[in-house]
Amino acid sequence: MDFSSILNRDPASIEAKIAEFKSGFNSVFISSLGKNGEVLSSYAPLIQSKHGDFIYISSVADHYENIISNPNNISIMFLEDECAAASPIVRKRLRYKASASKIERDSELFNSVFDEFEAKLGSARAIAQIRAMGDFAMFKLELSTGRAVFGFGKAYDINNGVITQATGANPHNMPHKH
């Protein structure tokens, strides 16, 4: 994926690159807050549906209880594979604050989203098995503020759908050369 065209800072172009980057993922890193105030990092299968973004996790997973207890205090991250990155220092990444709401298993929404999940990943036996497992739950993620980083000098804040160039309190005296 070539992100060099992002340099023009055109918001529509950047938005398209963010969508393209995000669409390449079937799982997402999750940071969640437990009842005891400790943060847990993990990952979960991601279902990018016409209905939004969903995760499907077991109630045995540590982050399940965290999401139930603190559904409005979640962070998710899409991170470029280290093997595909030009350098481990500048891995492309996309991070969002998120909230989660549990989807009832026997609802039309659950069935529609899971049908999309099966269609995308194929009707592998494992997918059919986890669909039937009663300890798994589906959560819809509502993404809010975030940041996309595509390299040095290519960091963008996302706030209510508005994308702006990220700046810091102590910017470099010498901008990154592209």
Task: Annotate each PLM feature.
Residues D2-S69:
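An N-terminal domain-cap segment
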Residues S41-Y43, R93-K97, A155-D157:
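Well-ordered beta-strand positions in beta-sheet-rich domains
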Residues S4, L33, D62-K120, M133, ...:
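Short, structured beta-strand-loop surface elements
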Residues F25, S41, R91-R93, F136:
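Sequence-level motif detector for i,i+2 pairs with an aromatic at +2
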Residues F29, K97-S99, E142:
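Residues located in well-ordered beta-strands
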Residues D2-P11, S112-K120, A124-H178:
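C-terminal edge-of-domain segments
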Residues D53-F54, I74, G146:
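Hydrophobic residues embedded in beta-strands of well-ordered beta-sheets
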